[in-house]
Amino acid sequence: MKQTLTYYNHTGKPLSQIYFNLIPQAFQQDGGGTVVERVSVDGKAGTLSQVKETVYALNLPTDLKADQSTDIQMKYQVKIPNIQNRFGYQEKVYNLGNFIATPAVYGKDGWTVEPYVDIGDAFYTEIADYDVTIHVPDGYTVASTGRETTKGRYQAKQVRDFAFCASDGYTVQQETYNGVDLMVYYNGDIKKTAQRVLNTAKQSLDLYSDAFGQYPYDTLSLVLNGLTGGVNGMEYPTLVMLDPDCKVEDLDNWGIGDGSDDTGPGVDYYLWLIDSATCHEIAHQWFYGIVGNDQIAEPWLDEGACRFAEYLYEKTYCADLDYNGYGSTEDLFQARYCMITGQEKDGQQYAEDKTDLDWSLYDWQKDDPMGYSEIYYKGGSLFYEMEQRMGEEKFRQALREYVRTFAYGTVDTEQFQQFWLGKGDFSKLFALYWK
C-alpha cells in the first residue's frame, strides 16, 4: 500500500510526534500484520516506532505548529489473516476493515494510546476525507466506503474510516432510494434475504433521518459476508457488514414459511433477528459515524444509542411482532430499569443491575467478557427512560439537536450528561445509572 496523509494539527500546541494505530498487528498469530517499508514527512525520512502493541509513534523531523499541516507518506504491506472476521478472508471473500494506518486521537488529556483488544469495536478515529484506489483481480466486485468515481477509485468525504469487501462471487441488489444508492452484496442463493435487508435499509433511513437528522451521504452498502461466531454485524462509514446466519430461505427449507410448525422458531421473531441486526448497524451511521465517541473507553455511548434505535424501528414497523416468548425491546428496557431501581414489574422481582457504564473494553475483557453486551441494554434503556420523561416529540427534537451539536466530532459521557441535563431534569435518573 502507498498512503499519503495530510495531517492537520488541531491540538492548539506544537507536536513533535504523531501516534498511529496499526490494527492488523493484532492478528499476527493468524497470519495478519502490517509491514512498514518506508515513511517520510514532507519528503524527509521518518520511522514508526512501536509504543504499545498496535500503537506506534512517528517522530517528526521538525515540530508541527498548531493549526499547520504536514504530509506523511507511507509504504507498507497489509497481511490479511485467513480467518472469518471483519478483517480477514475465507473462500475468496475478503473483508478489509480497520486495515489502514490511521492517526490516534489527541484528546483533552493528550494522545489516546489504546491498543486493540479483541472485544467490541476497539477503534477510535476522527473525521477525514478518503481518496482510495483499489486494484483487484478480474472478476472481483468491491463494496466500499464512499462512491466509486472512476474504475477502481473510491472517494468519501467526512467519514471516520474507510473499509471495503471484495469477492469474485458477489451478486448485487441495488436501488436508489431518496437520493441514496443502496446496494446489498451477497454470495450464494439468498436473494430473499438480500431483499429483506434492502427493505429494512430503506425503512431505517426513513426513520432515522427523521429521528436523528438527515442521512448525509449518497451511498450505503450492506454486505452479507459472514463474520465471526456471535457477531451479527459491523459498522463502517456508508458500509455495513452483516452475518447472514439467519436467512429468509431457512424458513422455506424448514417448511415453516407460514409459521405453523411449533417446533421451529417463531417466524416473526426469526425475521426480526435479520431486521434488528440490519437496523442496528445502520443506526451506527449516526452514532459512531456522525457523532463519534471513544469506542474503547466508553463503548456504551454508541451501542446504547443504536440499541435504542432498534427499539424505534421495532415500535414503528413491527408493532404486531410475535416475539416467540422472548419479550420486546421495550420489555427488556423496562426490565433493565427495574433491575437498576429494585422495582418489580408484573409481580416479578429482577436481579440487581451491576453493569458499569464507565467500564472500558479493557475492563470487560479482563473481568466479564461474556457480560459486555449488557451495556447495549443499559445504555439503550437510558435513552428510553429519557424519552418516557420528555415525551416522544420533544425527545426527538432534542435527539436531533444532540446529533447536530456533536456532528463530525466526538462526545464523551460528561458532555452527554451536560447536554441532556440542559433538556430535562435528569439528575436523579443519571444518579441511578451511574451509582
Walk through the language-model features, giving the residues of each.
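Asparagine-centered strand-capping/turn motif at beta-strand->loop junctions
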Residues: 7-11
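Solvent-exposed beta-hairpin/edge-strand motifs
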Residues: 15-45, 135, 139-140
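A surface-exposed beta-strand-loop module
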Residues: 32-92
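Extended, low-hydrophobicity, Ser/Thr/Pro/Gly-biased non-transmembrane segments
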Residues: 75-165, 169
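Juxtacatalytic substrate-recognition/specificity segment
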Residues: 132, 173-285, 289-298
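Alpha-helical scaffold elements that line and support the substrate/ligand-binding pocket
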Residues: 283-292, 306-310, 378-390, 395-396, ...
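Acidic/His/Gly-enriched intrinsically disordered linker/tail segments
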Residues: 303, 307-381, 389, 406, ...
